[in-house]
A protein has these predicted regions:
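Glycine-rich phosphate/adenylate-binding loop
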Residues: 2, 102-109, 114-122, 126-128, ...
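Conserved S-adenosyl-L-methionine
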Residues: 44-49, 129
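Conserved N-terminal Rossmann-fold NAD(P)-binding element of oxidoreductases
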Residues: 28-30, 53
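N-terminal charged helix/coil linker that caps or initiates catalytic domains
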Residues: 1-26
Length: 218
């Protein structure tokens, strides 16, 4: 077998699994400390088509946790697209209004790595739950061993997840999907962040997405 950048992914999932990854269309909402790491892992794993949506540019304060943030002033989604040809960048603010007008049906997996609650609720209601994965709060924490994956209704401790569940119920949502969250109590009031946690959130999202694509039990 000829070695290439995806040789070890082929070894892991076999040619059939790798073919599914190459054919997959994934949407990642958010290119910050969580979403950026998720996208990087997906691209390195051979996902053939990734649409990445985020409005922001890289700021110096991103450099404690966000990959490729050395390019201060660069548009986040475009910086990722320069590195990975499989990425289609969309520099857009994700709002409930944007979600209402966007076609999610063409994607095999949709990943929510944004912070805005209203937009998160709109996403959850717009996407087929079997294709949806979401991140809860990764800031204010330092212990990656406290990160968990569970059904959205089974989260605990995380204040963002608590509010998210409340707003989901209020919106009339009754579906079920997996989320990544932490059972570590927040250790500060400002949005302090540590790459050891935010990166692990993103990698957990990528793992869930890859398993959905290749058909492994999640």
């Amino acid at each position: 077998m000829q070695n290439d950048r995806f040789t070890r992914i082929r070894w892991l999932f076999g040619e059939d699994g790798f073919s599914k990854l190459q054919s997959a269309k994934v949407l990642v909402c958010g290119a910050g400390g969580v979403g950026g790491m998720c996208v990087d892992a997906l691209a390195r794993s051979g996902v053939g088509s990734i649409t990445l949506i985020d409005k922001d540019i890289f700021d110096v304060t991103n450099q404690n946790r966000q990959i490729y943030s050395e390019n201060v002033g660069g548009i986040k989604v475009e910086e990722f697209a320069k590195i990975y040809p499989c990425i289609t960048p969309m520099q857009t603010l994700i709002t409930p209004e944007f979600v209402a007008g966007f076609d999610f049906s063409k994607f095999d997996v949709v990943i929510d790595a944004i912070d805005d609650i209203a937009a998160k609720i709109a996403l959850a209601n717009a996407v087929d739950p079997s294709k949806f994965i979401a991140s809860m709060g990764g800031a204010k924490r330092v212990d990656p061993t406290k990160i968990k994956v569970a059904c959205v209704w089974k989260t605990s401790v995380d204040p963002l997840a608590r509010k998210y569940r409340y707003e989901l119920k209020r919106s009339g949502f009754s579906g079920n999907f997996d989320v990544v969250f932490s059972v570590e109590e927040p250790i500060c009031k400002p949005l302090g962040s540590f790459m050891g946690v935010t990166a692990c959130f993103g990698l957990n999202l990528a793992s869930l997405a890859v398993k959905k694509i290749v058909g492994q039990q999640v």
